[in-house]
Amino acid sequence: MNGIISFLDGFLISILLILWSYTLLNFNKLPKIIPIHFGFDGMPDNFGSKYFIFLLPILALLLYFFLGYNVKEINNYPVEITKENKDAQLVIGILAVKTIIAYVLFIFFTFQKHIVSISLKKTEKSIPMLKHILGLFFI
């Protein structure tokens, strides 16, 4: 199981590096004003400075460090923890949290990509929100 956790950690770090690289590579191309909030229909309804483009990568980094490394508490598990199942339950908890983090980081990257594309006028001015919301039901 440690191999799976190590693979998942590597995958999370890869997503973080891709998110930060994409942001830094496109920052100088962005106009001074970019969309920073989108309504439920996916259309931008608030605009702000291009420095807001760093909000999602910073939140992703905080999410990775604060949630990814604070899973070792055994007092919040839905089953009784015994000496026999302690290690297995810990691995299951770590896998669950890291999988959710991976999904959220992927959504952050998708939103970042759409914000950059809309700002550079490479795509239509909406984010397809429905598929991300429906994806939450499969977690």
Segments predicted by a language model, with ranges:
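Active-site and channel-lining beta-strand-loop segments
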Residues: 23-54
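Interfacial helix-start motif at the membrane-water boundary
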Residues: 43-61, 92-98
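Hydrophobic core of alpha-helical transmembrane segments in multi-pass integral membrane proteins
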Residues: 13-22, 57-69, 133-139
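Membrane-water interface of transmembrane alpha-helices
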Residues: 21-31, 64-78, 106-113
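Short, basic/aromatic recognition patches
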Residues: 4-29
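Alpha-helical transmembrane segments and their helix-start/interface "positive-inside/aromatic belt" motifs
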Residues: 1-13, 48-57
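Alpha-helical transmembrane segments of multi-pass integral membrane proteins
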Residues: 109-139
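Cysteine/selenocysteine-centered motifs that mediate thiol-based redox chemistry or coordinate metal-sulfur cofactors
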Residues: 70-108
